[in-house]
Regions:
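The feature marks the mature, well-folded catalytic cores of soluble enzymes
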Residues: 1-144
Length: 144
């Protein structure tokens, strides 16, 4: 459970959704693969961006045992909460942040994912399909 949930009021928001009868699941490492099954059935997945690329609107996710990547990949809709403090200009600055954290001995996730909007794919006939390899809709919310 990400401590930022409470910092940004998501804990209370989730409780209000549950009171209305909405199923809410917070990633729980103890559940293992069951988290993925739940994410696959979910309508919405919400994560915090660790680093956000202003140039492309790319969200950077640090995924590990306690914070799975399927949250941003499997639900039909993905919502990224972007703290303003995570904004950098482009990928070169993002990799610098990761490199500097590693140099300082700070833990860096075992998987770093870069997410830029909903999944798009087109075949040879140029028929665009949205959501083939991920969510159909993506929303970004910038917070102080």
């Amino acid at each position: 459970n990400d401590e930022r949930n409470d910092e940004y009021g998501r804990g209370e928001f989730y409780k209000s959704l549950e009171a209305e009868g909405t199923d809410v699941h917070i990633w729980d490492p103890a559940l293992g693969k069951e988290n993925q099954v739940i994410a696959e059935r979910a309508d919405v997945g919400i994560t915090f961006s660790e680093i956000t690329l202003a140039e492309s609107g790319t969200v950077t996710l640090f995924n590990n045992k306690g914070n799975g990547r399927t949250i941003s990949l499997l639900p039909k809709t993905y919502i990224a909460i972007i703290p303003k403090s995570t904004l950098v200009a482009r990928l070169s600055q993002a990799t610098k942040v990761i490199h500097e954290a590693n140099e300082k001995g700070q833990p860096v996730a075992s998987c770093v994912s870069f997410v830029t909007g909903p999944s798009n794919s087109a075949d040879i006939e140029m028929n665009l399909i949205v959501g083939v390899h991920g969510p159909i809709k993506a929303t970004y919310i910038v917070v102080d």
